[in-house]
Amino acid sequence: MEDGGAGLRAPRYPAEDTSPTTDRELRGFFCYGLAAEVFAVCAVGSFLPVTLEQLAREQGVLFIDKVTPCTAKNATVIANATVNALMSRAEGSDTHQCIINVFGAELTTASFAMYTFSASVFMQALALVSVSSVADHGTWRKKLLAGFGLTGSVSAMLFLLVVPQIFVVGSFLTVICVVCLGCSFVILNSYLPLLVLNHPVVQSDEDHPTASSSIPLQPISPQRSSRKSEESLHQVNRKEVDIGSKADSSDLQLSTKISSKGVGIGYMAAVSVQVICILILYIMNKTGVSSTLPLRTVLFFVGSWWLTFTIPSVMWLRDRPGPPLPTALYEGRAFVRTCMSYTIFAWKSLWKTVKVAVKLRQVLLFLIAWFLLSDAVATISATAILFARTELQMGTVAVALLSIIATSSGIIGATVWPIISKRFTLKTNHIIVCCLLLLELVPLYGLLGFLPFVQAWGVGGLQKWYEIYPLGIIHGMVMGGLSSYCRSFYGLLIPPGSEAAFYALFAITDKGSSAVGPAIVGKIVDATGQIRPAFGFLAVLIALPIPLIWMVDVEKGQEDAIRMAGLMKTTDDGHEDFESFEGSSDGHEAEGLMRDHD
């Protein structure tokens, strides 16, 4: 494959690189997934929240008296803290939380970590919108991938220098790391349709040359063709759907194969690196060094991993420039004008997609559910780690082991859920509901700790550290199902030809919502001094999307999507004409379209 083996297709725009995809380029694609996925799982999903909490803890005082240092070494101070803790327990306020002062605000160390991640995800959502157009247009694709990879990895490595006295710096570095990670994945994902389109397997298929061009090049088309009659509209729809169904045999299968392989490589590497990190923590903890140094060393190692594998990835990937955008959207210097043009185009595209999505009732229903669902999933992960660290007093090695168990269970879940679906002939939304019901067990089990008779047992309701590991297995199994089924279910509801725009909206909804839950949990912890009450909020948050997911009508959503796709292609001069769209009816016309679509 290295030399291609298929003739070059005609370029669709000036300066398009139509050279066949090579093994070297595919290795570059997989290599960056290997680099960044490790940081996403090992750092963001495990060690970053623990490190932030521990850095702050070493500068904090106990919540119960707001005087005693949390990491006091003096015997007298420790004795006084123990007495205070026993008195607090007798009063029914068992807490191990510490408080710190951040820019004049009094926060618990756990809420400090939650607020940091809330801010990180919010900034990431804003950045993803602005970067989305750059990923599909112009010549900055490879440069930005290298820039985000370099900036994010170096920021992670700088944690080695963050001592407890400057713990707030760790918060800023976390924001930079998370934003760079998200943006680099957007850039990397923009390579996938191009690698598929230029792959020799696809180029050699002469049966559907038009279908290849249906692979999204930009978030949303700025111009549409002239208006046709209603009859012509449906004829165009039938042709496009027929072409798309044929294209699935090669384009979609190849895309799925490449994407699945990349995810598999990334997760296997993440588990392996997680094991290495546990060894680093175990060895360094035996030396009696500062309690934060082993964690900071682990982040340095994970950041170095990210940087190391980013270098060959950038070397092996081609530039693959996209179609340029007009820079007349903003007046000013050339560089500033270009940056503003890309940013304005991205936000305009998002707004246009939102207006279309609002007209598609089933899409809107799912996106509301997805907003709640993704927020619940992101929040429960961070909450569980901090609960294990602060309430259950688990060490860093034990928390890292919990992350490995959850990740491994996720891989198993991705395999098991399709088997369950086939065995019991469950629809996709039914599988999602089953996953949510299973996930609901996690906060409900934590709430059992409030019951007096459970407290009298001394076990149950997450009173012992070992109880969290079975819950980690449940969480991992659920994530293995949700991560794949939600995306595929959403894909059934979006208009054909607008995949890039609607999946961008899907990702932005995910990241935007994930900033809400951690902030609310942080407020709860600040008010109560405990994390356990936050399980009540999480139980409600997980339950809310269940009826919404159940209500989504896939067949009606597909009908509406096809009709909207036709309407979008027949509006005059790109002006939106969606006000008249009222959703599908029960008529035979829609049924005929669905038969063509199937």
UniProtKB/Swiss-Prot annotation:
Glycans are attached at residues 74, 80, 285. It is found in: Vacuole membrane. Its main location: membrane. Residues 212-224 have a biased composition (Low complexity). Keywords: Amino-acid transport, Autophagy, Glycoprotein, Membrane, Transmembrane, Transmembrane helix, Transport, Vacuole. GO terms for biological process: amino acid transmembrane export from vacuole; autophagy. Residues 1-20, 207-238, 575-598 are annotated as: Disordered. Gene3D superfamilies: MFS general substrate transporter like domains. It is a multi-pass membrane protein. Residues 227-238, 585-598 have a biased composition (Basic and acidic residues). The chain crosses the membrane at residues 28-48, 111-131, 159-179, 182-202, 263-283, 297-317, 363-383, 400-420, 431-451, 465-485, 489-509, 534-554. Pfam families: ATG22. The keyword Cytoplasm does not apply. One of its GO terms (cellular component) is vacuolar membrane. PANTHER family: AUTOPHAGY-RELATED PROTEIN 22, AUTOPHAGY-RELATED PROTEIN 22-2. Belongs to the ATG22 family. This is Autophagy-related protein 22-1.
